[in-house]
Amino acid sequence: MAEPWAGQFLQALPATVLGALGTLGSDFLREWETQDMRVTLFKLLLLWLVLSLLGIQLAWGFYGNTVTGLYHRPDPHPQPPAAMGVFLPPGLGGQNGSTPDGSTHFSSWEIAANEALKTHRE
């Protein structure tokens, strides 16, 4: 069975931890306020973060539909790529824009050269 002092210690632990965190926070704020350069740096970094997020949001507004059209998973009732406004070269356009299953990884101009393709055994 637990000693009575162990129970008292566990009850006082959250108050002690919160007091230490409060002291640490007030010391940090006091140091922060005396350093004008830190405040300026913080404001600049915060401004940069906000502008970056706004830029990402703006870019997604312009190009989001294009990206979604290029990287979507095909549905059970597939439509031709031209119907989605995506024009792919012949032989490309599997799931997520990769090469279809069973195709080679060579581009069409290398295959059209009428060269015998080497396998990994050669």
From Swiss-Prot:
InterPro entries for the chain: TCTA
Alphabetical list of Pfam families matching this protein: T_cell_tran_alt
Compartments in which it is found: Membrane
Predominant location category: membrane
Cytoplasmic topological intervals: 30-43
Cellular component aspect of the GO annotation: membrane
PANTHER family: T-CELL LEUKEMIA TRANSLOCATION-ALTERED GENE PROTEIN
Protein encoded by which gene: Tcta
Function: May be required for cellular fusion during osteoclastogenesis.
Bilayer topology: Multi-pass membrane protein
UniProt source species: Mus musculus
Signal peptide positions on this chain: none
Keyword terms: Acetylation, Glycoprotein, Membrane, Transmembrane, Transmembrane helix
Transmembrane segments: 9-29, 44-64
Similarity-based family: Belongs to the TCTA family.
Region (Disordered): 82-103
Listed name of the protein: T-cell leukemia translocation-altered gene protein homolog
Glycosylation sites recorded in the entry for this protein: 96
Extracellular side: 2-8, 65-122
Positions of modified residues (N-acetylalanine): 2
Coiled coil stretches, renumbered: none
Domain of life where this protein originates: Eukaryota
